[in-house]
Design a protein with these regions (language model features):
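Hydrophobic pocket/interface hotspot
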Residues: 21-22, 31, 61-63, 78, ...
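Short beta-strand segments that buttress and anchor functional surface loops
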Residues: 61-66, 86-92
Length: 165
């Protein structure tokens, strides 16, 4: 059977309430706490959502990362957001990402599925391998922060080629 380069799944257990884990994805404050330098969610009418306001399906986003200049920006759309345990967004040419929050064996889990990744050399290298590496790091950072640890992100734009930026 051939390897499926068009999707992958990354999951981690995190000792935090499920709603807090969902809010980490669905609010500006949440995303900027563990993931991004800037997360803007805009309603379909163009109004910016407040920092603690949940984004909804149909909203657009703008994301900037720590350790990267402002011209490294991601624009996309929120495809689904149920307010408690499922969040899906477009991720540019890299496909779509679905986030599922669930409980199993007494633990809360965050699971990301990235799919619709182009099955060509660029897609395999940059989006399958690159995004899987990135999501692995950022989920580790989420776990660190939500379990009382430190922020592992590189915030120095002068440092290049790091796994944590």
């Amino acid at each position: 059977m051939a390897f499926d380069w068009t999707s992958f799944i990354v999951r981690i257990n995190i000792n935090a309430p499920a709603q807090k884990l969902y809010d980490a994805w669905a609010t500006r404050d949440g995303m900027e706490h563990w993931f991004l330098r800037l997360s803007e969610y805009k309603k379909p009418d163009g109004d910016l959502r407040h920092n603690l306001e949940h984004t909804e399906a149909g909203d657009n986003y703008k994301w900037l990362w720590h350790g990267w200049p402002d011209d490294t920006v991601e624009y996309g759309k929120i495809l689904e957001a149920n307010g408690k345990d499922f969040f899906k967004f477009s991720f540019g040419k890299a496909g779509n990402c679905s986030v599922k929050i669930f409980r199993d064996i007494g633990e809360n889990f965050v699971e990301i599925t990235q799919d619709n990744i182009p099955d060509d050399d660029h897609g395999r290298t940059n989006w399958h391998l690159g995004c899987k590496t990135g999501w692995t790091f950022y989920l580790d950072n989420m776990k660190s922060l939500y379990e009382g640890g430190i922020d592992l992100r590189n915030k120095n734009i002068l440092l290049k080629g790091l796994v944590n930026a």
